[in-house]
Amino acid sequence: MIKKPGILVTGGTGYIGSHTVVELIEQGYDVFVIDNLSNSHAEVIDSIEAITGTRPGYGNIDLNNKSAVQEFLRIHKVEAIIHFAAFKAVGESVDKPVEYYRNNLVSLLNLIELCKENNIKNFVFSSSCSVYGE
């Protein structure tokens, strides 16, 4: 069997991210997860392993820490990134606009710059239905 490329899933311990990680592993991809656990729990990695029989590579990293993300990319063979990591609570974003700006925009810019620096040509950005409110 030909080895499929390594894929980094940011926000991979969140609901959508973790389900995506399971599907990618089941399709034979080498999957890596970066998540700072601000909206999820590390036990999700254990659940992914229990479901798939494979434990994804994991880093508890804040995407605003560009050098830590760079080091993770240096260690792991990543050829694509699926970006789910973002804050999404509309009400909270009004109360904490700078925190949301840093988390949602600065981290995205870091990833895009790191893609260029590491010759990663495949990038998927996903939003959330919660941005539309209730």
What are these regions (language model features)?
Residues M1-E134:
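N-terminal Rossmann-like NAD(P)+-binding domain of SDR-like oxidoreductases, especially those catalyzing
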